[in-house]
Amino acid sequence: MALALITGSSGHVGSNLIRELTKQNYNVRCIDFDGDHRAYEGFDVEIIKGDITNKSSLDPIFKNVDVVFHTAALINLDRRYRDQIRSVNVDGTRNVCEASLSAGVKKLIHFSSVDAFYRFPIEEPLLEDRKLIDDPNAVPYDLSKADGQKIVMEFCEKGLDASIIHPTSI
């Protein structure tokens, strides 16, 4: 049975992934950052205390993992939290990519955001070839998701097999 690792497993997307992956008979390992275990109640999952911003803690967590669902993110639109947002969404994503590549993970599914793209022209469909935000004065969350996505794409060039998903606000 395949082993799936979920970052951000106590969040909205992560907790729904737990439900779906267990239905599909995956073994599920969850990185628990905040100690809120409500998302795991009633599910046979492995819970490991961890923090994606702490690179040295990730190697044992990624051991024997087949697929990583990287949903962890700090969602905040307040510019005062720019450094914390970048720490999680950019540096944390780099750490997840490095740990995935080092551990020989078969697939990384990165949850970016539609907010990683420039919104204009608004009348045109937003397709994945639209330019990523690169304005340092942009909303910190938006810029962090664009920069995190660029990191994932850089790791793909190094051999990481990854897919990027762009959910809307959830």
Regions found by a protein language model. Name each.
Residues 26-35:
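Conserved glycine-rich Rossmann-like NAD(P)H-binding loop of the short-chain dehydrogenase/reductase
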Residues 2-24:
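N-terminal Rossmann NAD(P)H-binding glycine-rich loop of SDR-like oxidoreductase domains
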